[in-house]
Amino acid sequence: DYLMEPDTLMGNAAVLYAAGDWDKWTIGLCNYDGINYGLFYSDWHLENIIKQLVTEVERLQGRNILIGECGHASRAAHDFIPTFMGKEARPVYNFMEYTLDCLRRGKIKLDPTIVTERVTYHDPCNIARSGWIVDQPREILRSFVPDFVDMAPKGEDNYCCGGGGGLVSIDELHDYRMEIAGKVKAEQIERTGAELLIAPCANCKKQLKEIVEHYELPCTVMGLHDLILRAIEIPGGRSPAERKEEAALFAM
């Protein structure tokens, strides 16, 4: 996200700032990458990387671990920090859980007049198959997106993007990813008629962007917090409508 999806991180920061938690968070310099390759091939590496993450949290004296829009990193931390750290484990949250909590408590406001496009949502396998993160993003989207439409099937039964398990990083498998799983996913996306496809996972975003380009689908792939960044009201800042007007001028 630092290199490929900066708007996602900007959306994260905007939520923290608007919620009044601007001075309560940080990003660890010694363990800023949430990828845990041990999840693919080695329990020993899985445990070692988890302990490196926990060591960094302890160095920073953090009370909670907040994972951004990455299905892999979220699952690795959420499922295996308690496994390996036991009673010493810090609570782990996906950023969408934090954002929804802020929304419910009235700590942030999202302008429902900003997003006029039809929006749909893709469920990343790593956070949806277990039923952990399914309803939260939909509740957030419905709070400020007038034209939200779900995929079919959805939630735990949603189709994989086709790039999971490391496949998205293998260029030699591009044709396979596009013509097998990608074809099914493209047809599913097309049926929604969506102009914006929300995918809160870097792996999924890369695969879905390639699918959209390959099948020439008329939609844009982005993260949930990319979209939130458009509509969030920033205390003391310009309104979402003013920011939208400015963005339109730059796009001309």
Language model features with spans:
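Iron-sulfur cluster-binding electron-transfer modules in prokaryotic oxidoreductases
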Residues: 1-252
